[in-house]
From Swiss-Prot:
Residues the record lists as N6-succinyllysine modifications: K122
Keyword Acetylation (UniProt): yes
Transmembrane spans: none
Gene field: Ssbp1
Protein's name in the database: Single-stranded DNA-binding protein, mitochondrial
Subunit structure: Homotetramer. Interacts with MPG/AAG, through inhibition of its glycosylase activity it potentially prevents formation of DNA breaks in ssDNA, ensuring that base removal primarily occurs in dsDNA. Interacts with POLDIP2. Interacts with PRIMPOL.
Annotated transit peptide: 1-16
NCBIfam families with a match to the protein in the record: ssb
């Protein structure tokens, strides 16, 4: 009953090694990020010559923990770390929804992938940038309490 589906899944994730076909086998990988946080600035739309426009905004995620002994764990000091993420939205439908409805302070859920790139700054110095490229889903819970889900 489950034999065929199990074999299909197994074949997708296991790389078959052989001398003849080893260069022909493509193995699957996964690059997926899910973030839930607050928008740090209103989105901006940018367009580079010859390329499609992109909507860009920053997103803050927080990590909180208590310090102290395990016996009095609830009595310890609360610490918090905020991490800022650069979100880029390239998909035409989702890009426009993000530009129109995402505002500073809104609570956002973003699903996408991590991208590492390089660029030259205005002083001609090579810089590295980490960007989250929004995929198919962007859920906006605005400051006013309204919710909007954008799917592309």
């Amino acid at each position: 009953m489950f034999r065929r589906p199990v074999l299909q899944v197994f074949r997708q994730f296991v790389r078959h090694e052989s001398e003849v076909a080893s260069s022909l086998v493509l193995e699957r990988s996964l690059n997926r990020v899910q973030l839930l946080g607050r928008v740090g600035q209103d989105p901006v739309m940018r367009q580079v010559e010859g390329k499609n426009p992109v909507t860009i905004f920053s997103l803050a995620t927080n990590e909180m923990w208590r310090s102290g002994d395990s016996e009095v764990y609830q009595m310890g000091d609360v610490s918090q770390k905020t991490t800022w993420h650069r979100i880029s939205v390239f998909r035409p439908g989702l890009r426009d929804v993000a530009y129109q409805y995402v505002k500073k302070g809104a609570r956002i859920f973003v699903e996408g992938k991590v991208d590492y790139g390089e660029y030259m700054d205005k002083n001609n110095v090579r810089r590295q940038a980490t960007t989250i490229i929004a995929g198919k889903k962007l859920v906006v819970h605005s400051v006013s309490g309204c919710s909007l889900e954008g799917l592309a």
